[in-house]
Amino acid sequence: MRLRYLFGLGVPVAAMALWANSGTSHSQTPVDEAAKVRCATRLSLSLTGKAPSASLLAAADPQAQIDTLLADPAFVEQFSRFVNSQMNPEPAMTPAQDSTYYLAKYVLENQKPWHEMFDGQYDIKAVAAANGMPATADVVADANGLGYFRSRPWMIRYAGNEEAGYRLSAAFRIQQNIIGLDVGAVTNAPGVDVSATGRMSGNCRGCHYDPYFALDKVAKILSKRVDTNPISFSPPTEGPQTILDGQTIANDGDLVKALLASNDYKFRTCRLAFVFLYGRPEASCESALFDKCIDDFTQTGDVRAALRAVAADPGFCE
């Protein structure tokens, strides 16, 4: 199942009329009124995917209504789909494998801090199709949960195909989801040794053993894939690894905790806010706004605070 990030289209007739009049009669529709309509429209489409409501169009200051838009179920759906598209770029085989979507929606609907996406005590359970209803998934409490990273559908999705069972895909994906790790894919030449030993040599070390994110070292503290039909996993056995600039990490819980404590996590969250609202990362000239986004997010831990900081900036409606 592919959950896509969709923007709604269309503007109310009243708004179109205001735009039309603004171009023909300044006495009937002042410039600031047209600007208000444009601002209301941009805010509503960006945050909820819907055309602005009559009350938003009538508001003296549309940006003062941002909290109302952030409380709209349409925003929850829109942002959950967006986050899923950013953290799982390929289509999933089942709804439950889009665990990011379901947990993002749960966190937003229940006003949870954003870090619970990654370290909350939850599990994502597949719900089979029944009685004419399509297959879906549920978020349930689980004392052993680690966001969605220990949910079986997600683990299967990123079990990978490394010959010894190291979950390199999961090692990358956990870091990509939390801190926005970006590693370019490399195609090996025929006959290249792709085993753990082979990855220790040449250019392969640059991603797998040497850097901050050392994929092989991270994979060693994750459970291993031991069977393929059905897929099963066994606990890690190779002990703590020194990764993330010299930190000693023993398991996936330690890994997630360290990533969430990093400035990279805050940076990642605010970049998501910019991409969601602007369709692009932050520009260098927006450094002050980006810093405010990070400050507001740090104070509350609520991803809505990051989005509010960006959407409430005067430049958003200019």
Report the location of each language-model feature.
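N-terminal mature-domain "stem" immediately C-terminal to a signal peptide or N-terminal signal-anchor/transmembrane
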Residues: Q28-L69
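Electron-transfer interface patches adjacent to heme c in soluble/periplasmic c-type cytochromes
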Residues: H26-D32, M155-R167, G206, P211, ...
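Boundary at the C-terminal end of the N-terminal hydrophobic targeting segment
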Residues: A17-T29
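Extended surface/linker regions that mediate inter-domain or inter-protein docking
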Residues: Q65-A214, D291-Q299, A311-A312
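Bacterial N-terminal signal peptides that target proteins for export
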Residues: M1-V11
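Short, amphipathic C-terminal "tail helix"
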Residues: A309-E318
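Residue-level detector of buried hydrophobic side-chain packing
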Residues: L43-S44, G49, V83, A273, ...
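Long, charged, low-complexity terminal extensions
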Residues: R38, L43, A74-M87, D264, ...
